[in-house]
């Protein structure tokens, strides 16, 4: 009986240690895309688009995406 109790205690201790090292789950907010309101013309420079979206429009990031009929600067904001 004592051996059974020590095995149960050992399993419980292992469970506690495992739970302590478990990484917390991070939930990322969804991002919604919107055409840049400050970009003019065809977008050919991802870095410039990203910087403009972040600095001028307060977006989290931006990139040049193909939207028929040309590439546009698209900014990404939290939904």
UniProtKB/Swiss-Prot annotation:
The keyword Transferase does not apply. One of its GO terms (biological process) is defense response to fungus. Disulfide bonds join 32-79, 43-64, 49-73, 53-75. Residues 1-29 form the signal peptide. It is found in: Secreted. It holds the Pfam family Gamma-thionin. GO terms for cellular component: extracellular region. Keywords: Antimicrobial, Disulfide bond, Fungicide, Plant defense, Secreted, Signal. Coiled coil: none annotated. It comes from the Eukaryota. SMART domains: Knot1 (SM00505). Belongs to the DEFL family. Possesses antifungal activity sensitive to inorganic cations. This is Defensin-like protein 3.
């Amino acid at each position: 009986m004592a051996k059974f109790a020590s095995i149960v205690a050992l399993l419980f201790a292992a469970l506690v240690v495992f739970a302590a090292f478990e990484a917390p789950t991070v939930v990322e907010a969804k991002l919604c895309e919107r055409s840049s309101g400050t970009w003019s013309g065809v977008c050919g420079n991802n870095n410039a688009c990203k910087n403009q979206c972040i600095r001028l429009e307060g977006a989290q990031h931006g990139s040049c995406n193909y939207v028929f009929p040309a590439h546009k600067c698209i900014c990404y904001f939290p939904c």
